[in-house]
A protein has these predicted regions:
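Conserved functional micro-motifs across diverse proteins
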Residues: 25-198
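Bacterial N-terminal signal peptides
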Residues: 8-19
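N-terminal secretory signal peptides that target proteins for export/translocation
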Residues: 1-6
């Protein structure tokens, strides 16, 4: 694994315990039992007053001074939706569930850090799976970064770079490197094992 090149932009990917399971893999077509388990996981999280966003598959760091990110897979999306709804005393409808399970894309959200408020504009993200580059369907960035806790010291600003990737374009079981190309130059690589993520 290559060490990240930071320069004036620091990028990382966050990993937390959320939905990680040794026998899991990113499910492109979840079975009914997997859907039920994901919904139950969300209800249980709500019963324990756990924040819905803790159910995403995270990578990197999770504090304000270091960059990070998360994946929104179908099963994670179901758990998060069930948590949100259960916290309001509601149940997801069949249409709600179908909307998540039939989603054609997976979202990858990262936070990068830099030293000027527009440093993230025109940043880009790809997935590398053993030399095969997967391009995103969409990439969105914060046009105006927010101040980091380090302000006025470096890194002064935090901004999101969010991309969606079509499930049919990548291998949901492959070791994958998320590569972010900051607009200010350079590249940063973070390696994940999609086989370990639900």
């Amino acid at each position: 694994m290559k060490s990240p090149v930071y320069g004036s932009v620091w990028i990382a990917v966050i990993w937390t315990c959320g939905l990680v399971c040794p026998s899991a893999a990113i499910e492109v077509q979840p079975a009914q039992t997997q859907v039920r388990l994901a919904l139950d996981r969300g209800k249980e999280a709500a019963a324990h007053r756990q924040a819905p966003e803790t159910l995403y598959a995270r990578f990197g760091s999770d504090d304000d001074l270091h960059p990070g990110g998360f994946l929104v897979t179908k099963l994670a999306g179901l758990s998060v939706m069930a948590t949100h709804m259960a916290l309001r005393g509601l149940e997801p409808s069949a249409a709600d569930i179908a909307q998540v399970t039939k989603a054609p894309t997976m979202l990858v959200s990262t936070v990068i850090l830099g030293d000027n408020p527009s440093f993230a504009v025109n940043s880009y993200m790809v997935l590398d799976q053993g030399g095969r580059v997967v391009k995103p369907v969409t990439v969105r960035v914060d046009g105006q970064a927010s101040r980091s806790q380090a302000w006025p010291e470096s890194p002064k600003f935090r901004a999101k770079v969010v991309a969606t990737f079509r499930y049919v374009d990548f291998d949901p079981n492959a070791p994958t490197t998320i590569i972010i190309f900051p607009a200010t130059g350079g590249e940063v690589r973070f390696t994940l094992s999609f086989a370990d993520i639900e």
